[in-house]
C-alpha cells in the first residue's frame, strides 16, 4: 500500500540526471490493456518490454519515472503550435511513465506505460485545484505503430497497490506534477529546450533519430 507520508515535490539532484540516468528506451507504440484512457482517464503510450533488461539497470526495477519523449513525425499526430519546433524536427515533450505490473490491477505481465504531458510552456492540466471537477489528463489522438524514443531522466517512486481507483488516479496526478516540477529545473529542462552542451545535444539528436 502507498505510505501516508507527503510526497516530495521533485526528485533527482538539482545538478541534473545522475547515474544510471539518462536511460534510452524506444519502440513502436502498441496497444496496452485498454484501461489507462477508458477507466482512469489517463492516456498512455505503451512500448514493448523486449530487451528491457539490456538497458535498464537491475537496481531500478519496477516503478514510476520521468523523462522526455519524441514521436516519429512521419506517423505521429500533428503537434500543436505550442509543441512545435523549427523545421521538421520532432517535438520533444515531457513524460511520466511506469514500468511494472500495476498491483492495483494485478497484472501478470510487465508493461511500459508512458503518459505524454503537454509542453512545460503550457498550464499544467494536473495542477492542484480547489474545484472538485475531475482532473483531465493530457490527451493526444491515437498513434499506434508510431516509433517512440524515450529518455528516462529520473526515478519518482516504487509501485503501490491502492484501496480505490480514485486513490490510484490521485497518485498519478501527483506523479505528473512531480515530473513537471523536476523537469522545470534548468539542468533537466535543457533536454526539452536545448543548449550548447554536447552531451545534452547528443541525447536530443538521438531522441529525434527516426
From Swiss-Prot:
Task: Give TM segment ranges.
Answer: none
Q: Reaction(s) catalyzed by this protein?
A: riboflavin + ATP = FMN + ADP + H(+)
One GO CC annotation: mitochondrion
Give the family, as the similarity comment puts it. Belongs to the flavokinase family.
Can you say what this protein is called?
Riboflavin kinase
Function text = Catalyzes the phosphorylation of riboflavin (vitamin B2) to form flavin mononucleotide (FMN) coenzyme.
The pathway it acts in is: Cofactor biosynthesis; FMN biosynthesis; FMN from riboflavin (ATP route): step 1/1
Annotated InterPro entries: Riboflavin_kinase, Riboflavin_kinase_bac/euk, Riboflavin_kinase_dom_sf
The note describing how and how many cofactors are bound reads: Zinc or magnesium.
> What is its cofactor?
Zn(2+); Mg(2+)
Q: Where is this region: Disordered?
A: 1-24
Amino acid at each position: 500500500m502507498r505510505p501516508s507520508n507527503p510526497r516530495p515535490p521533485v526528485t533527482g539532484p538539482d545538478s541534473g540526471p545522475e547515474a544510471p540516468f539518462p536511460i534510452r528506451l524506444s519502440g513502436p507504440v502498441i496497444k496496452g490493456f485498454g484501461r489507462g484512457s477508458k477507466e482512469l482517464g489517463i492516456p498512455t503510450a505503451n512500448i514493448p518490454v523486449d530487451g528491457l533488461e539490456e538497458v535498464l539497470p537491475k537496481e531500478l526495477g519496477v516503478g514510476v519515472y520521468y523523462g522526455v519523449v519524441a514521436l516519429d513525425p512521419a506517423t505521429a499526430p500533428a503537434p500543436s503550435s505550442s509543441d512545435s519546433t523549427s523545421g521538421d524536427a520532432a517535438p520533444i515533450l515531457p513524460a511520466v511513465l511506469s514500468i511494472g505490473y500495476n498491483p492495483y490491477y494485478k497484472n501478470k505481465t510487465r508493461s511500459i506505460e508512458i503518459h505524454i504531458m503537454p509542453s512545460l510552456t503550457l498550464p499544467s492540466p494536473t495542477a492542484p485545484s480547489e474545484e472538485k471537477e475531475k482532473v483531465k489528463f493530457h490527451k493526444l489522438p491515437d498513434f499506434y505503430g508510431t516509433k517512440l524514443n524515450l529518455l528516462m531522466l529520473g526515478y519518482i517512486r516504487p509501485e503501490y497497490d491502492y484501496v480505490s481507483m480514485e486513490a490510484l488516479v490521485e497518485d498519478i496526478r501527483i506523479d505528473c506534477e512531480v515530473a513537471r516540477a523536476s523537469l522545470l529545473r534548468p539542468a533537466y529542462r535543457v533536454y526539452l529546450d536545448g543548449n550548447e552542451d554536447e552531451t545534452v545535444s547528443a541525447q536530443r539528436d538521438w531522441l529525434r533519430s527516426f
